[in-house]
Regions:
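Conserved short submotifs of the Hanks-type protein kinase catalytic core
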Residues: 9-20
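ATP-dependent phospho-/nucleotidyl transfer catalytic cores
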Residues: 20-121, 133, 227-241
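Hydrophobic HxD+1 residue recognition
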Residues: 124
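Catalytic-loop signature of eukaryotic-like protein kinases
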Residues: 127-130
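Pre-DFG segment of protein kinase catalytic domains
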Residues: 139-142
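Active-site activation/catalytic loop segments of kinase-like enzymes and analogous catalytic loops
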Residues: 145-187, 203-226
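All-alpha amphipathic helical-bundle segments outside canonical DNA-binding/catalytic cores
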Residues: 188-204
Length: 244
């Protein structure tokens, strides 16, 4: 049995964010707020882009195993996930769910191998963001899934979970251009915009693997159910641009 004497001295440091507004993923956001968030994300990615990305670290997940982990999860949950997704995704979205059974691992492994590596937040979404009174991003929280991988994964994850499904793809392209411009401003000069567009579409497919475990989760209160339903609706809208 431990006593107070067995516990080493420690300090818990908390930032006071009471004057900031927490993002709300169920409510979503408009393109202007999304652009602010993506600008901050670009600066994070640029700080660890390519050769500057740490190769090892006890504080983040090894990105090399991520594709296989999520594909294994998909295979284990495939049948129940397909039933769950069939109630929430369009015919095009379901075609992708079924297609990744054969092609998914190769496509997401290729994305991880070919795209420049950076430090990924891993859960970059509105519920983990705080905004200041002037609209700027005040803080990003929940850093427990930090890993190495293509920056497009964080980008696709945020966009697919934040923007209303009726958002035109031209607006999505503008947001991607804004993110890319912030990367360039921060010093990333070897990543063409056309490459980002391609990586973004592949990243959406990887997110299908990631979402295949959602039907196993306990959603809790009404907000949890609303979050999942809204997330799938928005994600399905973004999948429409991705060819089979």
């Amino acid at each position: 049995m431990q006593t107070d004497a067995d516990v080493p001295p420690c300090i818990l440091l908390l930032e006071d964010l009471h004057e900031s507004e927490m993002g709300n993923q169920v409510a979503g956001c408009d393109p202007a707020r999304a652009a602010i968030a993506l600008g901050a994300l670009a600066r994070l990615h640029a700080s660890g882009w390519g050769d500057a990305c740490p190769q090892m670290g006890h504080w983040f997940i090894n990105g090399d195993i991520v594709p296989r982990l999520f594909h294994a999860q998909y295979r284990n949950n495939r049948r129940s996930f397909e039933r769950f997704a069939a109630e929430r995704l369009s015919e095009h979205g379901m075609a992708h769910v079924k297609a990744i059974r054969k092609t998914g691992l190769a496509r997401i492994t290729r994305l991880h191998d070919a795209a420049p590596r950076t430090i990924l937040h891993g859960d970059f979404r509105l519920d983990n963001l705080f905004f200041a009174a002037d609209g700027s991003l005040a803080a990003i929280i929940d850093w427990q899934t930090v890993n190495r991988g293509p920056g497009a994964l964080d980008v696709a994850y945020f966009i697919a979970g934040s923007l209303p499904p009726e958002t035109p793809e031209a607006v999505i392209d503008d947001l991607l251009s804004s993110y890319h411009g912030a990367l360039v401003t921060a010093g990333v000069v070897d990543y063409p915009f056309e490459r980002l567009l391609a990586d973004y579409e592949e990243a959406l497919l990887l997110l299908l693997h990631r979402m295949s475990g959602l039907d196993q989760l306990e959603f809790g209160d009404d907000r949890g159910v609303a979050l999942m339903d809204t997330w799938f609706e928005r994600f399905d809208a973004r999948l429409q641009r991705v060819p089979l």
